[in-house]
């Protein structure tokens, strides 16, 4: 199985896959707890929140240097996990967030949150969660005259946030995997995606393709579709993929994965 998108879906599904002996590789679920149960058939081709959160925090510490930082999250496994990781690292560096609180996924009116951000003179906001809520927060912040800089993870980094927030999405900082669609070695694949009217720029497109690559290469190398044999091969082999050379550790996580900070633009594009 190649799946799933959200950590909150992947984690309970992984219990079933392990119990039934089904190999699963997720290209999008980043919660560290997914691979901390000792399961043998669960892998991923994306970095962990425990990598991405500290990476974002170091950028905040070294580049943003906020005076009054707020950390907001959606109270879900992915978003709150990232927010907590950012909080822990910035606090170690002496930055004490003036706010750390959650919003409810699916909410539409964030006027109370924005009023509190303004009262606390917040000049920088890290948001852990997905694009639907952050898009509305950005748009409503612009409407209410709140102009602090915002930053979020790959869960907010897609064109839909620009559709929701409009001009208010300009200048949003987003941590994402590098733009694998810009790699010269991947241009034939990019053209193939475009020929089928598929967008090759999403953060999980090439990690998902790499997941298929490592699974099929393992099947060819072992001559088997047995999950136990495939899992053993995945843990013992280095793979050349569209996202670079991949190696898995004993837990099924990548031994190395890099994130990049991008400036988001209102037209749905990004620049490093």
Which sequence ranges carry the predicted segments?
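Extracytosolic ligand-binding ectodomains
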Residues: 1-272
């Amino acid at each position: 199985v190649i799946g799933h998108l959200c950590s909150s879906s992947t984690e309970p599904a992984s219990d079933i896959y392990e119990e039934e002996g089904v190999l699963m590789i997720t290209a999008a679920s980043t919660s560290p707890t997914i691979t901390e149960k000792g399961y043998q058939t669960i892998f991923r081709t994306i970095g962990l929140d425990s990598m991405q959160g500290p990476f974002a925090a170091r950028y905040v510490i070294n580049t943003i240097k906020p005076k009054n930082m707020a950390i907001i999250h959606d109270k879900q496994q992915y978003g709150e996990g990232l927010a907590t990781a950012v909080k822990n690292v910035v606090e170690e560096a002496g930055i004490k967030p003036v706010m750390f609180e959650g919003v409810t996924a699916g909410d539409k009116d964030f006027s109370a949150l924005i009023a509190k951000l303004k009262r606390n003179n917040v000049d920088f906001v890290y948001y852990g969660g997905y694009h639907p809520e952050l898009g509305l927060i950005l748009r409503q912040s612009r409407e209410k005259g709140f102009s602090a800089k915002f930053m979020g993870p790959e869960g907010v980094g897609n064109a839909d946030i620009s559709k929701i927030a409009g001009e208010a999405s300009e200048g949003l900082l987003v941590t994402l995997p590098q733009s694998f669609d810009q790699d010269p070695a991947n241009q034939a694949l990019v053209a193939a995606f475009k020929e089928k009217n598929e967008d090759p720029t999403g953060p999980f497109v090439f990690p998902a393709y790499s997941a298929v690559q490592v699974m099929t290469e393992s099947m060819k190398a072992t001559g088997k579709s047995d999950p136990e044999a495939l899992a053993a091969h995945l843990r013992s082999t280095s793979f050349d993929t569209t996202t670079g050379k991949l190696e898995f550790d004993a837990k099924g996580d990548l031994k190395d994965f890099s994130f990049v900070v991008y400036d988001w633009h209102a037209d749905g594009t990004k620049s490093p």
